[in-house]
Amino acid sequence: MSMEFFAWPWADGFFGADARKFRYSHLAGALTFIPYGTMVDHFQHIVYEHPELTPAQRHEEWKKLAAIYQPWMRLDGEIPFYGAGEYWQRQMHIYQSPFYYIDYCLAQTVSLQFWAMLQKDRADAWSHYMAYTKQGGSRTFTELLKNAGLTTPFEESCLRGVSEAAKAWLDSYDLTGIL
């Protein structure tokens, strides 16, 4: 996920006239993924704690969570599958790799830290990235972050900081000609 942000300078060569649209969409998608990924894990906790829930009750639980984690989503029946709270079923990780989405959320939060660094100093961001990746599997996740000068996603200030930076960038982005 982090390398996707490091590749932004080459987006023009790949996407051509749509590179600006890609950058906006990529950052917005990275930011909005975190609540979705969190919702997936929250839903699994409910289902595992209450295996007696009927399919209809599980759909209702998903709808409740969607209202909390994705309040911007319109689930008013345009697509019945989504409006009925059934769209958790399209998330194969729930069946194949339960509780895996937390990994994606953590990785995305770290990638947003790199994105924020890239906005200030690309060379410095790269040196932090190399410090992070060179350690490989030799340390715990939080040790990897600390040794590379990054903040753990478990700190509220981390998510708040990257979210505010991304929101400011998205709010100021010139959308002329790309919507």
Predicted regions and their residues:
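C-terminal, non-catalytic "cap/extension" segments appended to globular domains
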Residues: 2-13, 17, 33, 37, ...
